A protein has these predicted regions:
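RNA substrate-binding interface of SAM-dependent RNA methyltransferases
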Residues: 47, 74, 81, 109-205
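Glycine- and other small-residue-rich loops at beta-strand/loop junctions that grip anionic moieties
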Residues: 7, 34, 129-130, 155-156, ...
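Active-site/ligand-binding-proximal alpha/beta "capping" segment
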Residues: 200-249, 253
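Structured adenosyl-cofactor binding patch, chiefly the S-adenosyl-L-methionine
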Residues: 146-147, 161, 166-173, 231-272
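Boundary-proximal intrinsically disordered activation/regulatory segments immediately upstream
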Residues: 1-65, 70, 158-159
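Amphipathic alpha-helical repeat scaffolds
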Residues: 38, 132-139, 253-257
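A glycine-rich helix N-cap at a beta->alpha junction
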Residues: 71-93
Length: 272
């Protein structure tokens, strides 16, 4: 990595462009770039074949940890810019990210990028229809990674898959779990063609989730907390499932519900 003058002003054109990229999803789509902060998230990026475009580092903050060796080796392959701590505080979406922010090239996320399953393996997918809160999607990706889910499929999304808050809340799960974006119609057609059992989470006309077989090829489908699932998913479902609500409130946060349902699938699939 070659030494260079350190950017000390947030009015620098490169810093302004970075902040615009952070704030505007339309610009991210146009440039096909997104932002990642921190060693852990960047290492996840690199390990999954993402390509760094530009790296902004703060020498005052950058920590000399052994885990940085792989990251530092990658820096000469892309444009590297040094910034002061005051500038870094402005461009960092969250604190404690160890002095590294990078712009990353986007990947394709269509259904045709779904990984092929080994013969005899029953895939487990989680599907989210019209998810709009990036924090919820990030939390679900984190749970999906922990539960060994084969893919998270976002149908008719209302949030950007590369929203900085999504990346932050997923703790890198957006990179470790195959994530697909498509329409509900495309997804339903794919599941029907592949023999994937569709389980929709809803309160009405449903069975308790732990009484439902999740050992077969399965997609657990969830809607928004406000409106639930659309009719096309209800009509396409092979079964409707619910989590018992024993208090006054009639629903859980969608990320909490997803974690409960996914770990029931894990439990069933790991029974002796």
């Amino acid at each position: 990595m070659q030494t260079q003058d350190i950017i000390t002003s947030t009015q620098n054109p490169k810093i302004k462009a970075l902040l615009q990229l952070q704030q505007k999803s339309s610009l991210r789509r146009k440039e096909q770039l997104f932002l990642v902060e921190g060693r852990r998230e960047l290492m996840h990026c690199l390990s999954r074949g993402y390509v760094m475009d530009t790296v902004f580092i703060c020498p005052e903050i950058l920590k000399a940890e052994a885990e940085y060796d792989t990251l530092l080796q990658a820096l000469p392959k892309c444009h590297t810019i040094q910034v002061s701590s005051s500038v870094y505080d402005r461009i960092a979406y969250r604190g404690g990210t160890e002095g590294v922010v990078a712009t990353i090239r986007m990947k394709e996320h269509g259904l045709d990028t779904l990984p092929r399953m080994p013969e005899g393996k029953a895939p487990l997918y989680v599907v989210l229809e019209s998810v709009e809160k990036p924090g919820n999607l990030g939390a679900i990706l984190r749970s999906a990674d922990a539960a060994g889910v084969d893919a998270v499929i976002v149908c008719d999304p209302l949030t950007d898959l590369y929203n900085p808050n999504l990346i932050r809340s997923s703790l890198g799960g957006i990179f470790s779990v195959p994530t697909i974006a498509c329409t509900s119609q495309e997804c339903i057609a794919y599941f029907k063609a592949q023999g994937i059992r569709i389980l929709t989470a809803q309160l009405q006309d449903s069975s308790l989730y732990y009484d439902t077989d999740m050992t077969l090829p399965t997609a657990i489908v969830m809607g928004t907390e406000a409106t639930g699932l659309t009719n096309q998913w209800r009509e396409a479902a092979d079964a409707h499932i619910r989590i018992p609500m024993l208090g006054i409130l009639d629903s859980l946060n969608v990320s909490v519900s997803a974690a409960i349902l996914l770990y029931e699938a894990v439990r069933q699939r790991n029974e002796d």
